[in-house]
Amino acid sequence: MPRSKPYHHGNLRECLLAAGVEMIAEAGPSGFNLREVARRAGVSHNAPYRHFRDKEELLAEVAAQGFRELNAAMLEDAATESTPLGKLKRAGYAYVAFALRRPEHFAAMFDAPALDTNPACNQAGAEAFATLVGFITLCQQEGQMPEGETEGKTLFAWSLVHGIAKLAVTNRLPFRSPDRILQFAISAIDSSIKSLRDAN
């Protein structure tokens, strides 16, 4: 079983977060506790409270990390395309790829309880959603998608890629290969975008 290395002076917070990610990988957000995080980090059981009020705050920071990385991945992948629809497709692809690459963060982002009361986590999540809204808006402005109901169209697109990502990380798809999952995601994204373009 991999374990976090004992922390060095000045990086306790990062070490605790890394240990928290380990725990989520093994037991999920519901099996998370600060005492075990401290043990894995090689510090006293009181040490985590120097940086986090409780386990929910540490979980929220893991989730916020995930939302920030997801947002950056969507923007980076979208930048490889020149058309609004191409950018939207790549953002959707990046969403599923992120979940495959960071399943522990994905679990913290969407399965951990009581994160909606954490301002940093809420802000990071809102910024990621705003990125998707921006791509839908750009498609509408450039005439590649009907105008109106921007938020509804964004929720539709998000629901699709989130559903694929969730099925993938919980091994509910009939295939497990990351390449096959991403191929399926691309096909599903193409179909969903066609339906959005054809909507009146």
What are these regions (language model features)?
Residues L12-V21, V37, V62-G66, L70, ...:
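Generic hydrophobic, amphipathic alpha-helix propensity
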Residues A64-L88, Q123-A124, T137-L138:
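Amphipathic alpha-helical linker/stalk segments
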Residues T117-E142, E151-F156, Q183-S191:
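Amphipathic alpha-helical packing segments from all-alpha helical-bundle domains
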Residues L138, W158-R176, S191-N200:
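Amphipathic C-terminal alpha-helical segment
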